[in-house]
């Protein structure tokens, strides 16, 4: 056969992309991550809390649970048929889901991934129920009858300015059964803020992530100007507030497309973002002395993981993702083995400020996992990250991180960086 052979690439079905990646720090890969790991604390047993994508994992980060399909009054109703997840294998495919959103199903141009997980007759539910029933412990049963929960990526029901989001692939405004850490902090007069790169002074660029702020889904926040202002910040606001010493006590900082996501970004772009955030905090000595920076990523990006995954509930857990704790109080050069996931960040905030779990069904109700046990002795359980700190032996020095210039094209999924000021 001679000549150039061409063929059309298959259309993406959005059911997994890149499977593996390899980074070699011994040859210079990820120098900033390496420096942070050597000087502060990391975990080899931290997980995404939902076996799903970016949106669902950001929602659980702020609520300990999930968003659901609701009507204009906040009543639980069924979504259009084309938006209901059906993981049963589609005949004639390599185990592709029968219906997995974004235009599939009986309703064109909709699609999505809602599951009525309290109904064993709903697609895919009985299989998970049977799996959970065989566990040597009782998983958390937090699916509520009649509710269809979001498992993957949908835009928030509100734009960041508080107007209704009328675009496709949008979860309805969350009027009932949706309590965020922002609500809880405000109720206890603790300052908080969400800083999204690309916010652009109220005119979000394409790079701004519309699915990544868990507070932006909540009617209670987005229709209340005094609460809504807490989500109307960008990267420049974060840098200036850190310099001036008026950063909110709990601050969520979100990169745009310099997020290191597999397939379209690069790790050294993400490292530059992290280095800039760390430098902003360390550049204010008073702020640095009372701050914990938690650096994590929303989900694996499709990468395979061989580690233990604890079945916690219908929703997860999922594979391991990185977390680093950068703080004067972080254990130096420490690798934590305690079982943690994204809800551990909620539990950390709640432990630090003496707050209660958000709701009766949120996963911050779970007990703390056994310290340094890769598999918790009592399950289900997740840690609160306190095992990564030693408050008796602070080290207030700072490190200079190498920064390289880099830019990446706009894309769609972003890992979160959380910054918390300790009380």
What is each of the regions a protein language model found here?
Residues 1-423:
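N-terminal pro-sequences and low-complexity stem/linker regions of secreted or lumenal proteins
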